């Protein structure tokens, strides 16, 4: 047994790529050892902005031996007419280091049983550069010198040690050795690692805390200690903590101060300036009010920390001075001033201006508000919010702090005299901003956010701008997922197809300055609905694949909330004792209906058996949409109650009766029943055992 160390030394990696690169490295290492039949006890991973590393403990000295059977050429090819081994057979044997005499013959082929002895770990590890290091994939790449290899950042050194022995390999002009690098400023030159197991201690002595988890805990403890000492409430944003952890190798926390006059700025401006722009942690008093202090972390020790504090304070104050100036300047104008400027703001060159976008958002919001029974005041507030929703994009503050779009619209709207409902809706219009982000809390805000995202999708799809692969520069996947989540939260039921058709009627590209042509609404809605289905599958990744396929199989005009309900309904009943029997009865109907379509009206006078009459009485007045809208389980409970009547129906009746009139009536009844069952989707895709 031995310990093996691999370290990839790099120029500074962007903070957001460090953790995912570390995770990728350990997965590739595990796969490498699995493929090469090398056993080990455990693997430690390490990462800093300048390195990715693994330390493998108790690695076997040799890979496992194995026996394998290789299939060679067919007997027709392996032997000639006289039964002698052909050149093809001899070539196959030679390639495996044996002779045809070792062949087994069966099933028309020759086979070779081969015993493969284990290979030394050292020999296997020589391939780790090509099979692991070079195969790493990243979302961002760099090229350096005149090399063809692209990597997240240029490779500057490599360490490859099996206990104390160097395992050689080379990538470009960098040869693996035992020399690492310490902290860029606190440690000088190359540092020799005697043994693989000494890695962490060696780097600790060189001012590098190489274990990301240890480093993060150190940061957390240091900043909490400062906050506790000063009786501050500390707000530790986990994303900010992760980012700070990935830009330092030897963290030292410190506190800074700024003039309390800047506390007159909106709180979000202060926290954005500190958190997003400077990577500072803000603090509050016990009542939750922001204090004129911050906590930050330097990449180094406490030597001359006072200079670092002053420098960070100076940078923050400059940022806050700008914010204060922009805030005061913007208040010298009004919403109409900014709306006028928005007429020149391009939404997209193929789609039109931001003003045109706002007009379409207002149309969509109005259509949905009428359909979903908003009251008069809600409609009035929604119309006002939609009409001015993007005015803040032309303010000086958002021009400098782009991440505050929407938020500043709500703040400025309040200053300019808009009512609270409009202000809140404006501040919520971009929510959710991520797959797990907060949703709008107000009804009007949810509708504004929904309408904004719907127009974005409709417009880009109409212009032929549809995401492909991982490429999504306009965030359309995020918008679609936001739509799905808002609809699920609000339980709003509306048809995407009908909405788009109504929008086409309301929006004429030759009037009111609209640029988009929604001519082919059927094709646009088909693509948009399929796009939504992909997001629903993503949002429901915890649910069995077959239930997802079944739920998203048959879509009723793109009523997104109903699709969401289907997924959850099936998932909640899959463990029922009679689930299999229910699904089998219902899919029997769906299979027949798929093969036998009918537009014939059912004539109850043609019923022959009691089972026909009973099934008709149970289903004749049922509307699948009404069933779905009543509650999450109403539709399933109703369909499950039809299990016995359906089974009796098939036991007593021959659907394809010799009498064509009887047959057509029964086929029509099967199609009526299928229409109800399909409200849950294509249940033939459900896997029952």
UniProtKB/Swiss-Prot annotation:
* Annotated GO biological process: arginyl-tRNA aminoacylation; glycyl-tRNA aminoacylation
InterPro entries given in the database record: DALR_anticod-bd, Gly-tRNA-synth_bsu, Gly-tRNA-synth_heterodimer
Family classification: Belongs to the class-II aminoacyl-tRNA synthetase family.
* Keyword set, alphabetical order: Aminoacyl-tRNA synthetase, ATP-binding, Cytoplasm, Ligase, Nucleotide-binding, Protein biosynthesis
Q: How does it assemble?
A: Tetramer of two alpha and two beta subunits.
Subcellular localization: Cytoplasm
Q: From what organism does this protein derive? A: Oenococcus oeni (strain ATCC BAA-331 / PSU-1)
Provide GO CC annotations from the record. cytosol
The reactions it catalyses are: tRNA(Gly) + glycine + ATP = glycyl-tRNA(Gly) + AMP + diphosphate
**What's the protein name?**
Glycine--tRNA ligase beta subunit
GO terms of molecular function: arginine-tRNA ligase activity; ATP binding; glycine-tRNA ligase activity
């Amino acid at each position: 047994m031995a310990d093996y160390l691999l370290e990839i030394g790099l120029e500074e990696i962007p903070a957001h790529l460090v953790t995912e690169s570390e995770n990728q490295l350990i997965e590739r290492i595990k796969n490498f050892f699995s493929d090469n039949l090398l056993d080990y006890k455990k693997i430690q991973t390490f990462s800093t902005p300048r390195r990715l590393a693994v330390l493998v403990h108790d690695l076997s000295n040799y890979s496992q031996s194995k026996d394998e059977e290789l299939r060679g050429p067919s007997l027709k090819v392996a032997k000639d007419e006289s039964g002698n081994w052909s050149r093809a057979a001899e070539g196959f044997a030679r390639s495996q280091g044996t002779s045809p005499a070792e062949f087994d013959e069966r099933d028309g082929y020759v086979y070779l049983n081969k015993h493969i002895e284990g290979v030394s770990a050292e020999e296997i590890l020589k391939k780790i550069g090509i099979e692991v290091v070079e195969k790493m994939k990243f979302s961002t790449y760099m090229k350096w010198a005149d090399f063809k290899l692209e990597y997240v950042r240029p490779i500057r050194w490599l360490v490859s040690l099996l206990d104390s022995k160097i395992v050689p390999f080379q990538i470009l002009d960098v040869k693996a050795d035992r020399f690492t690098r310490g902290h860029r400023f606190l440690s000088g030159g190359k540092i020799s690692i005697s043994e693989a197991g000494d890695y962490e201690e060696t780097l600790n002595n060189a001012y590098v805390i190489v274990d990301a988890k240890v480093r993060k805990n150190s940061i957390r403890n240091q900043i909490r200690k400062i906050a506790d000492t000063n009786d501050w409430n500390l707000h530790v944003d986990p994303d900010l903590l992760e980012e700070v952890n990935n830009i330092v190798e030897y963290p030292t926390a410190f506190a800074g101060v700024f003039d309390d006059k800047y506390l007159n700025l909106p709180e979000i401006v202060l926290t954005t300036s500190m958190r997003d722009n400077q990577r500072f942690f803000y603090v509050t008093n016990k009542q939750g009010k922001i204090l004129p202090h911050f906590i930050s972390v330097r990449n180094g020790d406490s030597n001359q920390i006072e200079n670092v504090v002053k420098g960070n304070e100076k940078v923050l104050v400059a940022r806050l001075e700008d914010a204060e100036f922009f805030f005061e300047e913007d208040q010298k104008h009004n919403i109409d001033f900014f709306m006028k400027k928005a007429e020149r703001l391009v939404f997209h060159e193929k789609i039109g201006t931001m003003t045109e976008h706002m007009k379409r958002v207002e149309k969509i919001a109005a259509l949905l508000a009428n359909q979903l029974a908003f009251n008069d005041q809600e409609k009035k507030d929604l119309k006002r919010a939609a009409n001015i929703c993007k005015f803040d994009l032309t303010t000086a503050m958002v021009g400098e702090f782009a991440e505050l779009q929407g938020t500043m619209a709500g703040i400025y709207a309040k200053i300019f005299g808009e009512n609270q409902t409009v202000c809140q809706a404006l501040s919520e219009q971009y929510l959710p901003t991520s797959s797990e982000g907060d949703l709008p809390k107000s009804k009007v805000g949810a509708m504004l956010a929904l309408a904004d995202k719907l127009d974005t999708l409709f417009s880009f799809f109409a212009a032929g701008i549809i995401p492909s692969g991982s490429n999504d520069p306009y965030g359309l996947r995020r918008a679609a997922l936001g739509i799905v989540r808002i609809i699920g939260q609000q339980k709003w039921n509306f048809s995407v197809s009908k909405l788009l058709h109504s929008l086409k009627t309301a929006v004429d590209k030759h009037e009111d300055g609209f640029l988009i042509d929604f001519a082919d609404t059927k094709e646009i809605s088909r693509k948009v609905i399929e796009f939504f289905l992909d997001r629903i599958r993503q949002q429901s990744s915890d649910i069995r694949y077959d239930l997802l396929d079944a739920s998203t199989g048959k879509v009723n005009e793109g009523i997104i909330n109903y699709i969401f309900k289907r997924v959850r309904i099936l998932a909640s009943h899959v463990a029922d004792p009679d689930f299999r029997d229910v699904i089998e009865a219902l899919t029997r109907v769906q299979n027949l209906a798929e093969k036998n379509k009918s537009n014939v009206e059912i004539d109850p006078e043609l019923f022959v058996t009691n089972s026909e009459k009973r099934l008709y009485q149970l289903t004749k007045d049922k509307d699948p949409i009404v069933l779905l809208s009543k509650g999450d389980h109403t539709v399933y409970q109703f369909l499950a109650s039809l299990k016995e009547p359906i089974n009796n129906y098939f036991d007593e009746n021959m659907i394809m009766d010799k009498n064509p009139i009887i047959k057509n009536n029964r086929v029509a009844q099967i199609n009526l029943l299928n229409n109800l069952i399909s409200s849950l989707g294509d249940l033939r895709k459900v896997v029952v055992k």
